[in-house]
């Protein structure tokens, strides 16, 4: 029911008329020095793809690549991951470990969903409002951290968002969400582009409404831009038309490759404010309506104003 064809967040296999399995796998290298926090971020990042389809995680398997002389750190990584798996309501059912010079950790996750409730990533409708649930900028900040430039206050806020599960409340999932995806490696523009694939729709983004981590300007000015972010801009800027006068420092954040980034919802406009309220109650306190879905006949599909 979902797979490679439309760049979906996870694969979905229909069991019967009321049940389908959701499958995903993700692993990452460390973004922070603390192994326990790294484990939480990696697990939240892997679980996100199940939530992005509208599913519920059932069980997870650890995927570990780790140096054999750092087993104390590995224990903390696994404890961090287990914490998030438990928080998601899933079961940790085992895993597999390989010796590797560079640490890597992630999960293979199986979830469950009713086939009629699947939320695809490319089915928005004209007039839908777009809601983003987490601030952008974790890629830029992670690069600053690697270069020992990240300020503790900004890092603490980024860690809060990267470790927060993208679990939506049941009441919100009952609203008219027409399309849903999570913002990860391709950045906001890349994943929004996927949402606009195979249809005659575009999007209008209000750049000043898009939530971002505070204090990124100085890191951008210092050149702390990840290679993945620059690659995203190279690949997707051809799809973007922007209002004159938008600073390049502000624009690049829209292409920033995220880890455990937020969800992007395309929702019926009459229900957008209710969705925001429910998101706030779930702890997504920086959720914002960032734009809308529009009809386009030709040309660039994403307009930034």
Stretch-by-stretch model annotation:
Residues 1-305:
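Helix-biased detector of long, well-ordered alpha-helical tracts
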């Amino acid at each position: 029911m979902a797979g490679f064809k439309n760049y979906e967040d996870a694969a979905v296999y229909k069991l019967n008329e009321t049940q389908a399995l959701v499958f995903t796998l993700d692993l990452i290298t460390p973004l922070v020095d603390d192994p326990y926090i790294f484990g939480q971020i990696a697990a939240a990042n892997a679980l996100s793809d199940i939530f992005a389809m509208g599913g519920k995680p059932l069980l997870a398997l650890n995927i570990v690549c780790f140096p054999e002389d750092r087993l104390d750190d590995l224990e903390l990584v696994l404890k961090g991951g287990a914490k998030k798996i438990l928080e998601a309501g899933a079961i940790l059912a085992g895993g597999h470990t390989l010796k590797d010079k560079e640490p890597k950790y992630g999960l293979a996750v199986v979830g469950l969903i009713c086939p009629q409730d699947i939320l695809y990533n490319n089915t928005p409708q004209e007039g839908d409002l777009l809601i983003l649930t987490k601030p952008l900028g974790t890629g830029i900040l992670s690069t600053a951290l690697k270069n020992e430039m990240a300020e503790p206050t900004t890092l603490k806020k980024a860690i809060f968002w990267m470790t927060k599960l993208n679990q939506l409340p049941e009441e919100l999932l009952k609203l008219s969400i027409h399309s849903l995806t999570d913002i990860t490696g391709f950045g906001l523009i890349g994943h929004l582009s996927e949402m606009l694939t195979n249809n005659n729709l575009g999007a209008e983004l209000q750049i000043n409404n898009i939530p971002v981590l505070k204090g990124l300007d100085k890191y951008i000015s210092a050149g702390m831009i990840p290679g993945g972010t620059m690659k995203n801009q190279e690949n997707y800027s051809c799809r973007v038309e922007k209002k004159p006068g938008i600073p390049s420092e502000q624009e690049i954040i829209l292409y920033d490759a995220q880890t455990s980034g937020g969800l992007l919802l395309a929702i019926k406009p009459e229900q957008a404010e209710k969705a925001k309220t429910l998101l706030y109650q779930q702890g997504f306190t920086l959720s914002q309506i960032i734009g809308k879905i529009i009809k386009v006949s030709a040309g660039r599909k994403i307009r930034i104003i």
